[in-house]
Regions:
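N-terminal auxiliary segments of SAM/dcSAM-dependent transferases
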Residues: 17-63, 70
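Class I SAM-dependent methyltransferase Rossmann-like catalytic core
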Residues: 57-66, 71-103
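Conserved class I S-adenosyl-L-methionine
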Residues: 106-115
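Conserved SAM-binding loop of SAM-dependent methyltransferases across substrates and taxa
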Residues: 116-128
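Class I SAM-dependent methyltransferase SAM/SAH-binding core
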Residues: 129-167
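A short SAM/SAH-binding and catalytic strip from SAM-dependent methyltransferases
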Residues: 179-198
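A short glycine-rich, Lys/Arg-flanked "PGG" loop and its adjoining helix->strand segment in the class I
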Residues: 198-210
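Conserved beta-strand signature within the Rossmann-like core of class I S-adenosyl-L-methionine
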Residues: 207-220
Length: 251
Protein backbone atom coordinates (compact mmCIF):
# COMPACT_ATOMS: atom_id res chain seq x y z
CA UNK A 1 0.00 0.00 0.00
CA UNK A 2 0.98 3.64 -0.37
CA UNK A 3 -0.29 6.58 1.62
CA UNK A 4 -2.72 9.07 0.11
CA UNK A 5 -0.37 11.88 1.09
CA UNK A 6 3.09 12.42 -0.32
CA UNK A 7 4.59 10.73 2.72
CA UNK A 8 7.65 11.28 4.91
CA UNK A 9 10.13 14.04 4.24
CA UNK A 10 12.44 12.96 1.45
CA UNK A 11 16.00 12.12 2.42
CA UNK A 12 18.53 10.94 -0.10
CA UNK A 13 19.76 7.51 0.86
CA UNK A 14 21.77 4.68 -0.59
CA UNK A 15 19.32 1.80 -1.09
CA UNK A 16 20.29 -1.17 1.04
CA UNK A 17 21.89 -3.59 1.10
CA UNK A 18 23.35 -3.53 -2.42
CA UNK A 19 26.87 -2.20 -2.88
CA UNK A 20 26.86 1.46 -4.04
CA UNK A 21 28.73 0.75 -7.27
CA UNK A 22 25.64 -0.87 -8.77
CA UNK A 23 24.05 2.58 -8.95
CA UNK A 24 26.61 4.01 -11.35
CA UNK A 25 25.81 3.44 -14.99
CA UNK A 26 28.86 2.10 -16.77
CA UNK A 27 28.93 1.28 -20.47
CA UNK A 28 31.35 -1.56 -19.78
CA UNK A 29 28.70 -3.60 -17.95
CA UNK A 30 25.74 -2.58 -20.10
CA UNK A 31 24.38 -5.51 -22.07
CA UNK A 32 21.49 -3.43 -23.36
CA UNK A 33 22.71 -3.72 -26.94
CA UNK A 34 20.41 -6.72 -26.73
CA UNK A 35 16.76 -6.62 -25.65
CA UNK A 36 15.90 -7.61 -22.09
CA UNK A 37 16.93 -11.23 -21.66
CA UNK A 38 13.71 -12.24 -19.94
CA UNK A 39 11.56 -11.39 -22.97
CA UNK A 40 10.68 -14.25 -25.29
CA UNK A 41 11.90 -12.79 -28.58
CA UNK A 42 9.71 -15.05 -30.70
CA UNK A 43 6.53 -13.46 -29.37
CA UNK A 44 7.76 -9.91 -28.83
CA UNK A 45 7.14 -8.63 -32.38
CA UNK A 46 3.58 -9.97 -32.45
CA UNK A 47 2.81 -8.53 -29.02
CA UNK A 48 4.21 -5.12 -29.95
CA UNK A 49 2.32 -5.05 -33.25
CA UNK A 50 -0.96 -6.00 -31.56
CA UNK A 51 -0.53 -3.25 -28.98
CA UNK A 52 0.38 -0.54 -31.48
CA UNK A 53 -2.51 -1.47 -33.79
CA UNK A 54 -5.05 -1.49 -30.97
CA UNK A 55 -7.75 1.21 -30.84
CA UNK A 56 -5.81 2.61 -27.88
CA UNK A 57 -2.22 2.12 -28.99
CA UNK A 58 0.00 0.85 -26.19
CA UNK A 59 3.26 -0.91 -25.43
CA UNK A 60 3.67 -3.13 -22.38
CA UNK A 61 5.72 -1.47 -19.60
CA UNK A 62 7.90 -4.57 -19.42
CA UNK A 63 9.80 -3.25 -22.46
CA UNK A 64 11.07 -0.37 -20.31
CA UNK A 65 13.38 -2.71 -18.46
CA UNK A 66 16.52 -3.64 -20.29
CA UNK A 67 19.78 -3.05 -18.39
CA UNK A 68 19.83 0.69 -19.11
CA UNK A 69 16.13 1.06 -18.32
CA UNK A 70 16.61 -0.69 -14.98
CA UNK A 71 19.44 1.66 -14.07
CA UNK A 72 17.39 4.71 -15.08
CA UNK A 73 14.46 3.55 -12.95
CA UNK A 74 16.81 2.94 -10.04
CA UNK A 75 17.97 6.56 -10.24
CA UNK A 76 14.41 7.82 -10.76
CA UNK A 77 13.33 6.28 -7.44
CA UNK A 78 15.78 8.57 -5.61
CA UNK A 79 14.28 11.80 -6.96
CA UNK A 80 12.54 14.12 -4.46
CA UNK A 81 9.44 14.25 -6.68
CA UNK A 82 9.08 10.47 -6.89
CA UNK A 83 7.04 9.78 -3.75
CA UNK A 84 6.01 6.09 -4.22
CA UNK A 85 9.29 4.46 -3.16
CA UNK A 86 9.94 6.39 0.03
CA UNK A 87 6.26 6.38 1.06
CA UNK A 88 5.96 2.65 0.61
CA UNK A 89 9.25 2.09 2.46
CA UNK A 90 7.88 4.05 5.41
CA UNK A 91 4.61 2.09 5.43
CA UNK A 92 6.43 -1.25 5.33
CA UNK A 93 8.79 -0.15 8.12
CA UNK A 94 5.89 1.00 10.30
CA UNK A 95 4.09 -2.33 9.82
CA UNK A 96 7.07 -4.67 9.78
CA UNK A 97 6.18 -6.37 13.05
CA UNK A 98 2.67 -7.28 11.91
CA UNK A 99 3.93 -8.39 8.49
CA UNK A 100 6.51 -10.64 10.16
CA UNK A 101 3.95 -12.06 12.58
CA UNK A 102 1.55 -12.88 9.75
CA UNK A 103 4.18 -14.63 7.62
CA UNK A 104 6.56 -16.15 10.12
CA UNK A 105 10.20 -17.08 9.44
CA UNK A 106 11.61 -19.52 6.89
CA UNK A 107 9.28 -18.65 4.02
CA UNK A 108 10.34 -18.52 0.39
CA UNK A 109 10.21 -14.84 -0.56
CA UNK A 110 9.45 -14.39 -4.27
CA UNK A 111 10.12 -10.81 -5.39
CA UNK A 112 8.30 -9.88 -8.61
CA UNK A 113 9.95 -7.10 -10.62
CA UNK A 114 12.85 -7.19 -8.17
CA UNK A 115 15.17 -4.77 -9.97
CA UNK A 116 18.13 -4.13 -7.66
CA UNK A 117 16.56 -6.27 -4.87
CA UNK A 118 16.76 -3.36 -2.40
CA UNK A 119 13.05 -3.25 -1.48
CA UNK A 120 12.83 -6.92 -0.54
CA UNK A 121 16.21 -6.86 1.21
CA UNK A 122 14.79 -4.51 3.81
CA UNK A 123 12.48 -7.36 4.88
CA UNK A 124 15.28 -9.88 5.44
CA UNK A 125 16.36 -8.98 9.01
CA UNK A 126 12.90 -9.57 10.48
CA UNK A 127 11.26 -11.90 7.98
CA UNK A 128 14.32 -14.20 7.77
CA UNK A 129 13.30 -16.08 4.62
CA UNK A 130 14.98 -19.41 3.93
CA UNK A 131 15.13 -18.62 0.22
CA UNK A 132 14.91 -15.41 -1.77
CA UNK A 133 13.76 -15.61 -5.40
CA UNK A 134 14.08 -12.26 -7.19
CA UNK A 135 12.37 -12.22 -10.60
CA UNK A 136 12.88 -9.54 -13.23
CA UNK A 137 12.70 -9.25 -16.98
CA UNK A 138 16.15 -7.61 -17.06
CA UNK A 139 18.18 -10.74 -16.35
CA UNK A 140 21.70 -9.31 -16.50
CA UNK A 141 20.87 -6.42 -14.18
CA UNK A 142 19.12 -8.79 -11.76
CA UNK A 143 21.95 -11.29 -11.65
CA UNK A 144 24.45 -8.52 -10.91
CA UNK A 145 22.30 -7.30 -8.02
CA UNK A 146 21.79 -10.82 -6.64
CA UNK A 147 25.52 -11.54 -6.81
CA UNK A 148 26.23 -8.44 -4.72
CA UNK A 149 23.52 -9.37 -2.24
CA UNK A 150 24.51 -13.01 -1.62
CA UNK A 151 27.70 -12.34 0.43
CA UNK A 152 25.66 -10.29 2.90
CA UNK A 153 23.32 -13.22 3.52
CA UNK A 154 25.51 -16.34 3.10
CA UNK A 155 23.03 -18.64 4.87
CA UNK A 156 20.10 -17.67 2.65
CA UNK A 157 19.68 -19.24 -0.76
CA UNK A 158 19.26 -16.58 -3.46
CA UNK A 159 17.88 -17.77 -6.79
CA UNK A 160 17.52 -14.98 -9.40
CA UNK A 161 15.19 -15.70 -12.31
CA UNK A 162 15.20 -13.60 -15.47
CA UNK A 163 11.74 -14.07 -16.90
CA UNK A 164 8.56 -12.32 -17.99
CA UNK A 165 5.86 -13.03 -15.38
CA UNK A 166 3.20 -10.80 -16.95
CA UNK A 167 1.38 -13.64 -18.77
CA UNK A 168 2.44 -16.78 -16.91
CA UNK A 169 4.48 -17.72 -13.88
CA UNK A 170 6.48 -20.90 -14.37
CA UNK A 171 8.69 -21.46 -11.34
CA UNK A 172 11.39 -24.15 -11.48
CA UNK A 173 11.19 -27.24 -9.29
CA UNK A 174 13.99 -25.85 -7.10
CA UNK A 175 11.51 -23.32 -5.64
CA UNK A 176 9.69 -24.99 -2.72
CA UNK A 177 5.92 -25.16 -3.14
CA UNK A 178 5.32 -24.54 0.58
CA UNK A 179 5.29 -21.19 2.36
CA UNK A 180 5.63 -19.01 -0.73
CA UNK A 181 5.33 -15.28 -0.10
CA UNK A 182 4.97 -13.17 -3.25
CA UNK A 183 6.18 -9.58 -2.89
CA UNK A 184 4.94 -7.11 -5.53
CA UNK A 185 5.51 -3.53 -4.34
CA UNK A 186 5.55 -0.19 -6.12
CA UNK A 187 1.94 -0.15 -7.33
CA UNK A 188 3.11 -2.04 -10.41
CA UNK A 189 -0.26 -3.78 -10.50
CA UNK A 190 -1.40 -0.56 -12.20
CA UNK A 191 0.53 -1.62 -15.31
CA UNK A 192 -2.21 -4.17 -16.00
CA UNK A 193 -5.72 -3.60 -17.28
CA UNK A 194 -8.44 -4.60 -14.77
CA UNK A 195 -8.96 -7.95 -16.51
CA UNK A 196 -5.23 -8.58 -16.73
CA UNK A 197 -4.79 -7.66 -13.06
CA UNK A 198 -7.51 -10.11 -12.02
CA UNK A 199 -5.91 -12.90 -14.04
CA UNK A 200 -2.47 -12.03 -12.66
CA UNK A 201 -3.69 -12.15 -9.05
CA UNK A 202 -5.39 -15.49 -9.69
CA UNK A 203 -2.08 -16.87 -10.96
CA UNK A 204 -0.34 -15.65 -7.82
CA UNK A 205 -3.06 -17.16 -5.65
CA UNK A 206 -2.66 -20.52 -7.35
CA UNK A 207 1.13 -20.35 -7.13
CA UNK A 208 1.30 -19.47 -3.42
CA UNK A 209 -0.90 -22.37 -2.32
CA UNK A 210 -2.85 -22.71 0.91
CA UNK A 211 -0.03 -21.70 3.25
CA UNK A 212 1.40 -18.82 1.21
CA UNK A 213 0.76 -15.08 1.07
CA UNK A 214 0.88 -12.05 -1.22
CA UNK A 215 2.26 -8.65 -0.19
CA UNK A 216 0.96 -6.15 -2.73
CA UNK A 217 1.69 -2.44 -3.00
CA UNK A 218 -1.11 -0.24 -4.37
CA UNK A 219 -1.05 3.55 -4.62
CA UNK A 220 -4.12 5.60 -3.69
CA UNK A 221 -5.71 8.59 -5.41
CA UNK A 222 -3.36 11.55 -5.68
CA UNK A 223 -3.66 15.20 -6.60
CA UNK A 224 -2.84 15.76 -10.27
CA UNK A 225 0.05 18.08 -9.41
CA UNK A 226 1.69 15.41 -7.26
CA UNK A 227 1.45 12.87 -10.07
CA UNK A 228 2.69 15.36 -12.66
CA UNK A 229 5.78 16.12 -10.59
CA UNK A 230 6.48 12.44 -9.89
CA UNK A 231 6.15 11.26 -13.47
CA UNK A 232 7.47 14.31 -15.34
CA UNK A 233 10.46 15.21 -13.18
CA UNK A 234 12.46 18.38 -13.61
CA UNK A 235 15.74 16.66 -14.53
CA UNK A 236 14.14 14.51 -17.23
CA UNK A 237 14.89 11.04 -15.85
CA UNK A 238 11.35 9.80 -16.45
CA UNK A 239 11.51 11.07 -20.02
CA UNK A 240 14.80 9.25 -20.62
CA UNK A 241 13.35 6.12 -19.00
CA UNK A 242 10.31 6.17 -21.28
CA UNK A 243 12.29 6.97 -24.43
CA UNK A 244 14.56 4.03 -23.66
CA UNK A 245 11.53 1.81 -24.30
CA UNK A 246 11.71 2.84 -27.96
CA UNK A 247 15.44 2.14 -28.02
CA UNK A 248 14.78 -1.29 -26.55
CA UNK A 249 11.91 -2.39 -28.81
CA UNK A 250 13.62 -1.07 -31.96
CA UNK A 251 16.39 -3.60 -31.38
Amino acid sequence: PASSSIGPTYQRYAPMPIQPDIYTYNNSDDTSSEPAAGIAQSGAAAELAAGLLDDKAHVSPKYLYDTLGSKLFEALCLLPEYYPTRTEDAIVAANMASITQAMGPDATLIDLGAGNCAKAARLFPMLQPRQYVPIDISRDFLEQAAAQLQPRYPHMRITPLGLDFSHKLDLPASIPAERRVFFYPGSSIGNFSPDQASAFLRRLRNACGTDGAIVLGVDLIKDAAVLQAAYDDAVGLTSAFNLNLLRNVNR
